[in-house]
Regions:
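Signature of dsDNA virion morphogenesis modules
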Residues: 1-129
């Protein structure tokens, strides 16, 4: 089995069922909320292949217990997959991921005062992305 990480881009223009919006916490901090991938739906062409995700596809990974020898699942939400552009992380409580009947829903609270947050929040709020 390969340890290589596969990445996918969230694209509302390529898939109208993909959801991305901005909410605001009571303390004024932005929260990025989205749903991707939707279940049971073929993707756009990803370079000679298509994929679809079935309900439960991520359950084993997301449900890993803290005492699992592999460690608790550490999922990191990044803007354009850049390591320096972190929007949220499950292990520090700034990213929550849940499987729903429609797809994988995430809620990311980006860090305060970073260039990434300053760039991404207005783009989502104004529906550029």
């Amino acid at each position: 089995m390969s340890n290589q990480i596969e990445t996918r881009y969230l694209s509302q223009s390529a898939d109208p069922d993909v959801e991305l919006r901005l909410e605001t916490r009571d303390d004024g901090r932005p929260v990025i909320v989205g749903m991707a991938p939707p279940w049971n739906k073929w993707s756009v062409d990803l370079g000679g292949f298509k994929e679809r995700f079935m309900p439960g596809a991520f359950r084993k990974y997301l449900d890993r217990a803290p005492n699992d020898p592999r460690g608790k699942a550490d999922v990191v939400a990044k803007y354009n997959h850049q390591d320096s552009a972190v929007l949220g992380r499950t292990t520090n409580g700034t990213l929550d991921i849940q499987e729903t009947d429609k797809g994988l829903v995430f809620r990311a609270t980006p860090p305060v005062g970073t260039p990434t947050t300053a760039e991404v929040v207005p783009l989502i709020r104004d529906r550029y992305i």
